[in-house]
């Protein structure tokens, strides 16, 4: 965190910087020996190359990349090294964050890019513009019922179970990669729906820090962590049985607590391709 404060100090003289926060595992207090430093900068106007390069030079960093504006993520970013420490800076406009908050909290927008940004607001450590960050966090905390239902439906999409009906055939044929892909998709669906039920924004599409992410959640099926581990650690037949039981519990929990329409998912979950007998000799 000392390095982060040193870097943050190089931005203080720029009147266009509205807020700066330490993000990622460092900002969340989860840093380990694999962690890089991630900084989120919020600007009142588009940052120039000079705005972005000045802090790198001020701390004698070694620039690796100065990325152009990414229209999908709505950010500029740069990567550099401070000695052996990797630093990634993500730059956003304050107007973009205000719009994301409006779209997600007021319009139940399920876009993962927007949800990851709101999750970052909640999990980061502000070093500049703390008052603005606090106001954003307050707005992000208003996770409405409509958004819960929408996110549950997004997580429990029937497409997650695209090869579910053929699961026994996949096992019998030794299609290990296909079974693993199916189980992995189910794991993501389970965690995504549980996060929604607990009104928690998805912090990363790859669900980094999985155990920490689901620890302490209140609205969960019994033995969630243990049952998720079975999806990857158990033999395929056992793992698929565990997946079916877990998904059934998740659907019951979601239907009891939300207005999500899970009929199509239920129908897909009940599917099973039956063997019709031995092949002709």
Where are these regions (language model features)?
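Helical scaffold of the NTase/Pol beta-like nucleotidyltransferase catalytic core
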Residues: 1-21
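Short secondary-structure capping/turn segments at boundaries of alpha-helices and beta-strands
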Residues: 6-8, 24-28, 65-66, 75-77
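Alpha-helix boundary recognition
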Residues: 12-13, 35, 172
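Catalytic metal-binding acidic patch
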Residues: 22-60, 72, 80-91
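Short, solvent-exposed loop/turn segments at secondary-structure junctions
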Residues: 27-28, 94-95, 201-202
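Conserved NTP/Mg2+-binding pocket subregion across the NTase superfamily
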Residues: 58-173
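Conserved nucleotidyltransferase catalytic core and NTase-mimicking acidic/glycine-rich helix/loop elements
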Residues: 135-281
